[in-house]
Amino acid sequence: MRVATQLRVGIVGGGWNGCHLALELKKQGHRVSLFEQKPDIFQGVSGNFGIRLHKGPHYPRSKATRDSCREALVKFCETYPELVVHHESAIYAHGEADALGNPSKVSDEAFRDVCYESPECTAVDPKANGFQGLISAYNLDEPSVAIGDRLRNTFKEKLGRAGIYVHLNATVDRIIHTEDTNRIQTGDGQYVFDVVINATGYTSLLPQNIADALPVDIGITYQTCIALVYEDQQPQEKPLSFIVMDGWFPCVMPAIDTNEPLQKKYILTHGSYTILGSFDRHEEGQELLDSLDEEAIAARIKPHCEREITRFWPGFLDRFQYRGWKGSVLAKLKTTSEFRSSLTFEKDGVIHIFPGKVSNVVTAAEEVVPLINDIARRRHGVVREWNGVRFTVSSAFHTHSKEIGDKPGLGEHHTSNLQTYVSLVTAN
């Protein structure tokens, strides 16, 4: 549906949220520009890590996240079918004890129930499939999303076909708010927009004291995360995924970055060993990431991760060979239930998106649209509002506000200061 009022929209951040929103808002008739500080789009976690298109069991303690995942998954697959990677198997396993010897954070009954929220779920015999140390395991029809060049090339074609200009190597220093516009300040100058969308992964350009203004007192941490890269020596026509739940357990995901058959690239992550630090500021997490090198990863991280995966999948290292590592800094909500859906809000004409799971880009966009329409109404509609009072754009409140607010001084020779009767009575 195209909108009655065409707005100039500037989007900062060329990851999943930024690129998807650019396409959706262009379809609605807005003029859209995209700004990415790196040399290419999808240079963060969404373009480099193997990413699950969640059906929900990953979050057994957050029904809200599971419901959001299932709702968003259907819409995502309908929107980007060419980027959906279907799996031979997607195993969710319930571990006996995590890396610290602790039991799972959920009971086996609860774990089974959340897996069977997906109607195609089937129970798997762990030992018959080469696994150990598991209470139970289930196979779901759960895909992942393509990454790397396959993802970038798909979106470059889509953005180009839509006529959306992408500013690369464009670091946005600040967003300047005025009464009717927002200006994006880069090293090349200023760009004027009606609406700016901050899709930087909640890492920059945030309003001062925004935590105090939000309707919920949310906790945020910035985590330095890495993934170990492996090559499958026995590639199949379709890839597989394997995760142990719920606590400090390992996970294996495919990292599909081409359309070639028999994909070999996988990543190994862990609930604790590949989350290397949690910080109050993104910059602190980036400092840790920048300090890492292959020697540090090989000596301090890789042995723990391989010990953990082989506790549950003894044949892993016989099939997969280590090829390196990659890292990123991610914003994460601090919640007891591990809530992971996105949050979207607007302040001063800037819409900010706190990222959730990749499929949440669809639902985040659905929230952005009414926020943009509300901005259009406030700035370009026929009704204005001030402190709860509404009036039309033809009202003198709007057209002559300065003039009607300019009041005469006390005692000034002015009709509004006349006291004629009192003066006549006094004179007599």
Swiss-Prot record:
Gene name tied to this protein: kojA
Domain of life, per lineage: Eukaryota
Function text: Probable FAD-dependent monooxygenase; part of the gene cluster that mediates the biosynthesis of 5-hydroxy-2-hydroxymethyl-1,4-pyrone, also know as kojic acid, a by-product in the fermentation process of malting rice that acts as a chelation agent. Glucose might be converted to kojic acid by a combination of dehydrogenase and dehydratase reactions involving kojA and probably additional enzymes. Improves the antioxidant capacity via the accumulation of kojic acid that is also a strong oxidant.
InterPro entries, sorted: FAD-dep_OxRdtase, FAD/NAD-bd_sf
Organism: Aspergillus oryzae (strain ATCC 42149 / RIB 40)
Coiled coil: none
Observed effect of gene inactivation: Leads to the loss of kojic acid production. Leads to the declined expression of kap6.
Cofactors required: FAD
The enzyme's E.C. designation: 1.14.13.-
Uses: Kojic acid can be used for several biotechnological applications, including use as an antibiotic, as an additive to prevent browning of food materials, and as an antioxidant. Kojic acid is also interesting as an inhibitor of tyrosinase. Finally, kojic acid has also been shown to have strong nematicidal activity.
Pfam family, one: DAO
Binding site for FAD: 52-60, 328-329
Flavoprotein is among the record's keywords: yes
Induction per the UniProt record: Expression is controlled by the kojic acid gene cluster transcription factor kojR. Expression is also positively regulated by the secondary metabolism general regulator laeA. Expression is negatively regulated by the transcription factor kpeA. Nitrogen deficiency increases the expression. Expression is also regulated by the kojic acid related proteins kap1, kap2 and kap6.
The protein, known as: Probable FAD-dependent monooxygenase kojA
Intrachain disulfide bonds: none
Gene Ontology, cellular component aspect: cytoplasm
